[in-house]
């Protein structure tokens, strides 16, 4: 899936997600599920959304949380938000 995000931006997003989920970067893949594999709860999902809005200078509707289940989904949502 093409997101239009460069490698540096993807790395920054990955660092944010890993920091909030309190996991090492090598523990997460683009397709590993935050809730099922990394014990993320809804509060952490909101924290991820807020941090992404702040650092990536985008606005993300909370309805997009259902798509932000893994890094791949986060990349797509951020990419789409950046285009708006």
Swiss-Prot record:
Record key words, sorted: Phosphopantetheine, Phosphoprotein
Keyword Phosphoprotein: yes
Presence of the UniProt keyword Heme in the record: no
Post-translational modification: 4'-phosphopantetheine is transferred from CoA to a specific serine of the apo-ACP-like protein.
Sites bearing O-(pantetheine 4'-phosphoryl)serine, chain numbering: 42
PROSITE patterns per record: CARRIER
Signal peptide annotation: none
Record-linked Gene3D superfamilies: ACP-like
Cross-referenced InterPro entries: ACP-like_sf (IPR036736), PP-bd_ACP (IPR009081)
UniProt xrefs under SUPFAM superfamilies: ACP-like
UniProt domain Carrier: residue ranges: 7-82
Role this protein plays: Acyl carrier protein.
Protein name, entry field: Polyketide-8 synthase acyl carrier protein 1
Organism for this UniProt entry: Streptomyces avermitilis (strain ATCC 31267 / DSM 46492 / JCM 5070 / NBRC 14893 / NCIMB 12804 / NRRL 8165 / MA-4680)
């Amino acid at each position: 899936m093409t997101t239009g995000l460069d490698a540096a931006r993807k790395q920054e997003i990955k660092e944010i997600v890993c920091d909030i989920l309190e996991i090492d970067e090598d523990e997460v893949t683009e397709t590993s599920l935050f809730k099922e594999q990394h014990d993320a709860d809804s509060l952490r999902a909101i924290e991820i959304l807020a941090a992404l809005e702040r650092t990536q200078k985008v606005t993300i509707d909370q309805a997009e949380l259902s798509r932000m289940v893994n890094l791949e989904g986060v990349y797509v949502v951020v990419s789409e938000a950046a285009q708006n």
